[in-house]
Regions:
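A compositional/biophysical signature of low hydrophobicity enriched in polar/charged and small residues
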Residues: 1-150
């Protein structure tokens, strides 16, 4: 598929959708002084091209009681087990992000917990996965930047 060329109108539509994925096409159309049909066609093209991949729900973890955030680096003794280890990590619901990385750790995870006891139990679960020989944890003191628009 060839590269999709976005014009200013496409960028304006995207900016509005990034700000609020649930904004009705009619609202976008009114603000941009175009028809809702134009918005629909352009969004559909961006979806077909794969530029837009659905929409997402953003949870307020604080309101759910998950105020404790930690980052856990996993050292793996056999990198051929990484796929298996990632599958096991995916079974732990409190692990919200996992990256296969270069450098100090083989896998780097973000966990959310209701407190230190819960976080300890999650970290122990990660440490018990076959193939993980050590973990290293860092507690997040404050999430200063979390810009979903970047």
């Amino acid at each position: 598929m060839s590269k999709m060329k976005l014009d200013d109108l496409d960028h304006q539509i995207l900016d509005m959708l990034i700000e609020n994925t649930r904004i009705p096409f009619t609202d976008i159309a009114k603000k941009l002084l175009i028809s809702a049909g134009t918005v629909h066609v352009r969004v559909k093209k961006m979806e077909e091209y794969g530029l837009i991949k659905g929409s997402s729900l953003i949870l307020d973890y604080d309101k759910l009681g998950y105020t404790f955030i930690a980052y856990v680096g996993l050292y793996i003794n056999d990198t051929s087990k990484i796929k298996f280890i990632v599958q096991r990590i995916n079974e732990i619901p409190n692990v919200t992000v996992a990256h296969i990385t270069s450098g100090k750790f083989n896998i780097f995870c973000k966990i959310r917990a209701k407190g230190t006891t819960s976080a300890k139990n999650i970290i122990f679960k990660l440490d018990e996965i076959d193939g993980v020989y050590r973990t290293e944890s860092m507690i997040s003191m404050e999430e200063s930047i979390n810009d979903k628009k970047r």
